Amino acid sequence: MAKEISGYIKLQIMGGQANPAPPVGPALGQRGINIMEFCKAFNDKTKAFAGKPIPVVITVYKDKKFDFEIKSPPASHFIKEAAKLKGGSKEPGRSIAGSITKKQAEEIATQKMKDLNAHDLEQAVKIIAGSARSMGIEVKD
């Protein structure tokens, strides 16, 4: 018989840098999860992504045990990295903060493919291009 699920917690934590401080500690403490156990397991799994924001979905069970699923870093992180920017435009649609090439958008799409709601690479590239546009970053051919 499957374990009974108590709830889910969605967080975005820097890879390899989970610690009991907010937002991790309070979110897990409310559900009665062993915070240090989660932090050690998360940091071990995300050593390769050090310094990148990692979305994680934690499944909490009734017996206070947990599982977690790591997703790939957000598309906005990859887009800013490719455009060599710290942030997007203050006025997307009016001012352009930077640009990325279509090839860079394809590379980002291949990295994000498993987390995107797309069936092929062409659709995934359109999603990434839309994200870039909403950040005020132009996609050039």
UniProtKB/Swiss-Prot annotation:
UniProt PTM comment: One or more lysine residues are methylated.
Short name of any one Pfam family annotated for the protein: Ribosomal_L11_N
Single GO MF descriptor: large ribosomal subunit rRNA binding
GO biological processes: translation
GO cellular component: cytosolic large ribosomal subunit
CDD domains assigned to the protein according to its UniProt record, in alphabetical order: Ribosomal_L11
Coiled-coil ranges per UniProt: none
Keywords: Methylation, Ribonucleoprotein, Ribosomal protein, RNA-binding, rRNA-binding
Similarity annotation: Belongs to the universal ribosomal protein uL11 family.
Role played: Forms part of the ribosomal stalk which helps the ribosome interact with GTP-bound translation factors.
Assembly: Part of the ribosomal stalk of the 50S ribosomal subunit. Interacts with L10 and the large rRNA to form the base of the stalk. L10 forms an elongated spine to which L12 dimers bind in a sequential fashion forming a multimeric L10(L12)X complex.
Protein name as it appears in the record: Large ribosomal subunit protein uL11
Taxonomic source organism: Pelagibacter ubique (strain HTCC1062)
